[in-house]
Amino acid sequence: MSWIKNVTESPTSLIKKVSCGLIIAASLYAIAPSLSALVFGDSKQSIGKYTTVGLINRGNDCFITSSLQGLAGIPRFVEYLKRIRTVLLELETKLSNNAKGDNPTVDNTTRHSRLENSSNSLAPLHESLTSLILDLISVKDRKTSISPKIVINTLESIFKSKISSKQNDAHEFTLILLQTLQEERSKLIDYSKQICNLNIPKFPFEGETSKFLVCLKCKGLSEPSYKQTFIRELSVPQQTSENLSNILAHDETEIIDDYSCLICQIRAILNHEEYRNFKDCTPDEILMLDRLKNYATKAPINENLPFEVEQYVKRYSKGNLQVSNIKGKVIKKDVVVQLPDILIVHLSRSTFNGITYSRNPCNVKFGERITLSEYTLAESGTITENRQVKYNLKSVVKHTGSHSSGHYMCYRRKTEIRFGKEDESSFRRAPVVNNEVNKNREQNVAHNDYKKSRYKKVKNALRYPYWQISDTAIKESTASTVLNEQKYAYMLYYERVNK
């Protein structure tokens, strides 16, 4: 500090005093953060350069790595896995207490042995995914990659078969994954009812669609059929480009020609007999016509009629009216009656020319936000829009190459950086490879979940809101880059905004 003494002891003047003050002020400003850290401790954790976690590709596993990264980018799915984990731990505690005569002290031996052998677990795939995905969404200060084999081994154990080493499809893998998760959840519900009624979270991917026909002439509806869905399947049109919203709208309707509408046929018979004043109708036929009047106002257009009524309608031919010739156009509608919390859209790009399959290069224009409608089908046959639901884009899986080969990669939206730790010692760890320390050695890394977490939004996330992940290769990406993947977008992952 001699330089400060020299300055202060030199002949004084107004200018020198001012200069001295400025120098001291600047020095204090520079060292103040260090002094604060020494006295009060570091109140902020420095982020600096950071990255996320990649997945190791064993050879042709890009369909697995991209699918898992896509799911990891959805906060609601992560929350669902955590809630299932809590249910499993509560069940385990309950069983342990019952076995020990309600002793509140829980021995971890059973827990660890069960988790080591996924086949003995109530929900092995849930546990494997929880372990892996919590590692994937963690933030690292150096390049880090882990193996997806914890999930692969669990699936192979469940299905008792090996996953093919050949090129596979990301959509098919994701569908199998979701179906298996739902089956595990159903078993967990049944099992928990036997022990204690626990609050099992709703499966966030579950939606429901209804298919039915609408006659363009009589406006009658067919009997609707309902289907549980996990992924929205869309056929990409064979054209240069199209908006996702238009594909969704077109997917809900299809025109069918030459359809034999039962209601139109019955009404034609009744009108014709009234015009003829029921000439030459026998008493039995009059009774039959009375029965038809009930069907004409209440029945669906595809009603399964009693045999004798069906035969009368089919064979009716009087004067210039032959019922078999009455045909018209109907609209085949496929509407959503229950929208999921997490919407996965599969853009099917397969085209068949009668001989071979090829890849459809149509540019599908999609946005970071979409709004979908949910409908209600009343018993009266009316269709009403129930509500509109907004979704935000969280992940995109793209595919480059041909129909039969190529490469999958994922864009995953960044989440907030979280600080803080939570004990995760009861859960299995995914093998990790630290590329800067040892590229050839796998080691176990303990995942640090977040208890009393502090959240911080990184400035760079505003400019580069997405991770671009190709197996172990990771870099940041802008929103415009993601939205420009119109030619290669294969699966879109949206999360519900308003619940």
From Swiss-Prot:
One of its GO terms (molecular function) is cysteine-type deubiquitinase activity. Its EC number is 3.4.19.12. Belongs to the peptidase C19 family. The gene is UBP16. The keyword Kinase does not apply. InterPro entries: Papain-like_cys_pep_sf, Peptidase_C19, Peptidase_C19_UCH, USP_CS, USP_dom. GO terms for biological process: protein deubiquitination; proteolysis. It comes from the Eukaryota. Signal peptide: none annotated. It holds the Pfam family UCH. The keyword Hydrolase applies. Gene3D superfamilies: Cysteine proteinases. Residues 53-497 form the USP domain. The active site is at C62, H407. It is an enzyme of class 3 (hydrolase). This is Ubiquitin carboxyl-terminal hydrolase 16. Present with 450 molecules/cell in log phase SD medium. The lineage of its organism: Eukaryota, Fungi, Dikarya, Ascomycota, Saccharomycotina. It catalyses: Thiol-dependent hydrolysis of ester, thioester, amide, peptide and isopeptide bonds formed by the C-terminal Gly of ubiquitin (a 76-residue protein attached to proteins as an intracellular targeting signal). Keywords: Hydrolase, Protease, Thiol protease, Ubl conjugation pathway. One of its GO terms (cellular component) is mitochondrial outer membrane.
